[in-house]
């Protein structure tokens, strides 16, 4: 199952719960959520999806990632900025994107092109 959610500012948690409730989880199917705004990840009930893929933050746009340090201007904020995150049994991958938002600047946080290989553990 592939479910997509656009950006929702207010009422994010209620919106996601209603959206996921509209589509019954199919037994023996992987359930992926394409979530524009990674901040909504914390509002997803544990086990509601197998993987959340997100973007929105552009990886923080400014940071020290290019120097080998996992730090961006968003590191201490509530926003998951880039990479893999876990909350209970839920997993989130935030893509850094290739461009920028707002001010035309990207320093120390390179864009990325990702290739993901999903392997389903059939024992679960």
Give the label of every model feature segment.
Residues 1-124:
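Soluble catalytic domains of enzymes that build or remodel membrane lipids, polysaccharides, and related
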